[in-house]
From Swiss-Prot:
Descriptive protein name: Autoinducer-2 kinase
One BP annotation, GO: carbohydrate metabolic process
InterPro entries listed in its UniProt record: AI-2_kinase, ATPase_NBD, Carb_kinase_FGGY, FGGY_C, FGGY_Carb_Kinase, FGGY_N
Gene that encodes it: lsrK
Source organism of the structure: Salmonella paratyphi A (strain ATCC 9150 / SARB42)
SUPFAM superfamilies xref list: Actin-like ATPase domain (SSF53067)
Similarity comment: Belongs to the FGGY kinase family.
Gene3D superfamilies from the UniProt entry: 3.30.420.40
Pfam families in alphabetical order: FGGY_C, FGGY_N
One Gene Ontology MF term: autoinducer-2 kinase activity
Amino acid sequence: MARLCTHTESGHYLMALDAGTGSVRAVIFDLQGKQIAVDQAEWQHLAVPDVPGSMEFDLAKNWQLACQCIRQALQKAAIPATAIAAVSACSMREGIVIYDSNGEPIWACANVDARAAHEVSELKELHDNTFEEEVYRCSGQTLALSAIPRLLWLAHHRPDIYHRASTVTMISDWMAFMLSGELAVDPSNAGTTGLLDLVTRNWKRSLLQMAGLRSDILSPVKETGTLLGHISQKAAEQCDLQAGTPVIVGGGDVQLGCLGLGVVRPAQTAVLGGTFWQQVVNLPAPVTDPNMNVRINPHVIPGMVQTESISFFTGLTMRWFRDAFCAEEKLIAERLGIDAYSLLEDMASRVPPGAHGVMPIFSDVMRFKRWYHAAPSFINLSIDPEKCNKATLFRALEENAAIVSACNLQQIAAFSGVQADSLVFAGGGSKGKLWSQILADVTGLTVHVPVVKEATALGCAIAAGVGVGVWPSLAETGEKLVRWDREHKPNPENFAVYQQAREKWQAVYQDQRALVDGGLTTSLWKAPGL
């Protein structure tokens, strides 16, 4: 049972459940948006033997982990379950859950599941090789991460699952279903299936029919911040929440993260610096890229969409560099009681802008239709240890992440006509003051860094609060609750240096991709079906 105490009144807190790629969290906020308690548990996705690229989502075990986090968060907050006014859930996007006619979840895959490479290729050939273009025009998605090839894979290889399927939702919706017994999806997350119409914010059943798939398995669509149901007695017994507590429709992690950052108005722009880096720009109305380079997702704000570009493995590349080459710096940082990245940034701050011409080759700009990258490498190294050392390479990596972001933002501006005048930098990368300044210098934009740098759970809590009338609207509340840590103005001289570096990098990267095309090097990552 939930632990009782006397220092709180009923309904003065909100709970957000955040199902990420690598972990699940239960986070409790007060009504001023302050985080009160959090509990987190890592989870592992299941590779199926003899199914290359498979990454199944363990429904039974992961629900147990979610319940564990809920119980522990309540205990850490020292509040009774009756103090929770509402609960909402968010998750990684693209991952799907399938239910049978009895409402039982019977199969799920994580966002990174890539088993359907053959099906992607097969689908691209439909309708005189125009099917993917039709999917993109309607939904803003290509087939690489879509639910359509995964459903086709099930029809081909797991007909026992496919023919029992009654409903499909996203992982955030599954968590809400496990709490309430009610099934629905929201546009921001369901939009990443490639089956949702950007204009109507509802399903486009004809896309499934065009692919020869069933169109009778789509859940009702409800907007973020609306009432889904209430905590069931069964869920209350499993996770110690109070039966009858409202469960509010949540959404996709990036869109709710933008809500938590106050990125809720047209033309507002954010760079989210995590394992992947996302460059997100709000558009006032749906529009897609004629070149299909970037994805378009429904925002949690009704009527608004977000263009989203992705830089691959940016945060992971920095971690690889730290762990592979900077053992000494890690030891020194530990002795000094500081983060190793802070020490590396201090070293890199003494390297001039442009990093002596060193060009990292890791993530390409986003090319959603034909998405692959060159082989990881550093180009234009020097054997002068004063100019080419760990500090130089670290700075070069930070500069390169900013250059890729700037290129992606330029692609968005080219087709949308929306030009950012500043940007919000959040996520783990924004903790670096040097990195934040480099991003300002490369883009030529003022960079705003929030106090709360991981804002997805806060955005989810805002949805919960709006759903029970604690706050009036999503957009107004997102703007009200965001607090700013610092601001970085671009340096015009550095901007000029980086413009030249950017042009050189783009030319060199094109040649490096050609080496992959020729089979001489191995791509950092390729989308399924390439």
